[in-house]
Curated annotation (Swiss-Prot):
ATP binds at T13, T14, S15, T263, G306, Q310, G407. It comes from the Archaea. Glycerol binds at R83, E84, Y134, D241, Q242. Sn-glycerol 3-phosphate binds at T13, R83, E84, Y134, D241. PANTHER family: GLYCEROL KINASE (PTHR10196:SF69), SUGAR KINASE (PTHR10196). The keyword Magnesium does not apply. Key enzyme in the regulation of glycerol uptake and metabolism. Catalyzes the phosphorylation of glycerol to yield sn-glycerol 3-phosphate. This is Glycerol kinase 2. HAMAP family: Glycerol_kin. Belongs to the FGGY kinase family.
Length: 499
């Protein structure tokens, strides 16, 4: 078993981070550098790949400095990343030919509307995804269609495509390795998750040459070596951030579920070695530990959770800092009958209504901002239940424990209400850096830094467990009222347009 430490590279939507772990999965040092978002037109969201790379290198140096280690002490590197974000670069010079098109970018909606209308079933059956600008496929097509000479260069093999993990590994290996893992490939809308290969029919449909795509490898594997830090270090782990978080929550068994509470919420359920195709949820690859053998997941995305707290802070100016919401909400015993539906941009799973709009209902003369604060926190828990109920139904598996992470999971009031409204235990781990920890685990397994999943399970520790404290009748009464509130928000924008 090698000694030393594992370096986890965690490249997010607004910052590049690096975290150093030891064999007990303790965090020894964290580096973080923000980089700007670029909005050249309405609906466009871009990053400059050079800014990402520079921020990432600074974050690595900062983490190593804080951990008081040198590059020769790094046993392996894992890379986790914001998913779907798309970069095309020149295969010879390594220079990006355009900015990275970010997962939030909506410019390709005309392409995906056409796919939805004509090829919805085929794409869902092959990729587990629904045609949406969110995924990489339509972004690649847009660059090939809109930049002069790029398509002809791509057809000659002079262009490379990658999600952020692929680009960083390419840069770390000085252009020697062009690779991604199963989890990231499954977010492109180009990867057949049944056959575990790039899908030629979809590639032909979008006119994307297969030669630009990376090799797809297991999430725990030695892809190559980097020398940019001063020593030769294996790059041995790669996974998209939400899948890495599921792995970091040691959710290795079928039916285990985690929810990440961020700006939105991502709920993933391990569904084992056979995909389940759902009407309301995405089917995705969680990870692959061996070639041609993967673990699948069901994924539900909630658009607005933590963002509702930001709106309460910045839009209403009701609090000075996001952390102020918990004590304010705790100053009242309940919401006083107030329900808040945060449909600022429509509703995601399981409603899928882009015309829904936000509402606050149940206000009386006695309602205070504390009641609204509490209703905002409770709306996060209700939305999680909406998705978890669908997961149970479509997987045929009863969920008994919800593992939680992300900024919102630090809020004890919210986590207690989450347990109350689900009627199950909610478990928060000691180390909340679950995405970076997950990819550190994947990197360590590939180089025998750790020997087994069982060993990793032993090292994972719980910070706090939340047990349901209300009875079933009360739980269902509140949840039914939530569903009634949601019903009143549905189709609002459309109903205005018809008048």
């Amino acid at each position: 078993m090698p000694g030393g430490f594992i370096l986890a590279i965690d490249e997010g939507t607004t910052s590049a981070r690096a975290i150093i772990y030891n064999q007990d999965l303790e965090v020894l040092g964290i580096g973080q550098y923000d980089f700007p978002q670029h909005y050249p037109s309405p609906g466009y969201v871009e990053h400059n790949p050079d800014e990402i790379w520079n921020a990432q290198m600074l974050a690595i140096k900062e983490a190593m400095k804080k951990a008081k280690i040198e590059s020769r002490q790094v046993a392996g590197i894992g890379v986790t990343n914001q998913r779907e974000t798309t970069i095309l670069w020149d295969a010879i010079s390594g220079k990006p030919i355009y900015n990275a098109i970010v997962w939030q970018d909506r410019r390709t909606s005309n392409i995906t509307d056409w796919l939805k209308e004509n090829y919805f079933g085929m794409i869902k059956d092959k990729t587990g995804l629904i045609p949406d600008p969110y995924f990489s496929g339509s972004k690649i097509k847009w660059i090939l269609d809109n930049l002069p000479n790029v398509r002809s260069k791509a057809e000659k093999g002079e262009i490379k495509f990658g999600t952020i993990d692929t680009y960083l590994i390419w840069k770390l290996t000085n252009g020697k390795i062009h690779v991604t893992d199963y989890s990231n490939a499954s977010r492109t809308m180009l990867f057949n998750i049944n056959k575990l290969e790039w899908d030629r029919e979809i590639l032909e449909l979008l006119k994307i040459p297969e030669s630009i795509l990376p090799e797809v490898r297991p999430s725990s594997d030695i892809y190559g070596y980097t020398e940019v830090l001063g020593s030769s270090i294996p790059i041995s782990g790669d996974a998209g951030d939400q899948q890495a978080a599921l792995f970091g929550q040691v959710a290795y068994d079928m039916g285990e579920v985690k929810s990440t509470y961020g700006t939105g919420s991502f709920i993933l359920m391990n569904i084992g070695s056979n995909p389940i195709f759902s009407e309301n949820l995405l089917t995705t690859i969680a990870w692959g530990l061996e070639s041609k053998r993967v673990t699948y997941a069901l994924e539900g995305s909630i658009f607005i959770t933590g963002a509702a707290v930001q709106w309460f802070r910045d839009g209403l100016r009701a609090i000075d800092a996001s952390d102020d919401i918990e004590p304010l909400a705790a100053s009242v015993p309940d919401t006083g009958g107030v329900y808040f539906v945060p449909a600022f941009v429509g509703l995601g799973a399981p409603y899928w209504d882009p015309y829904a709009r936000g509402l606050i209902i149940g206000i009386t003369r006695g309602t205070t901002k504390a009641h609204i604060a509490r209703a905002i926190l409770e709306s996060i828990a209700y939305q999680n239940r909406d998705v978890i109920e669908i997961m149970e139904k479509e997987s045929g598996t009863k969920i008994n424990i919800l593992k939680v992470d992300g900024g919102g999971a630090k809020d004890n009031l919210l986590m207690q209400f989450q347990a109350d409204i689900l009627g199950i235990r909610v478990v928060r781990p000691k180390v909340m850096e679950t995405a970076s920890m997950g990819v550190a685990m994947l990197a360590g397994l590939a180089i025998n830094y750790w020997n087994s999943l069982n060993e990793l399970k032993q090292k994972w520790t719980v910070d706090k467990e939340f047990i349901p404290s209300i009875n079933k009748e009360e739980r269902e009464r509140r949840y039914n009222a939530w569903k009634e509130a949601v019903k009143r928000s549905l189709g609002w924008e459309k109903s205005l347009g018809s008048k």
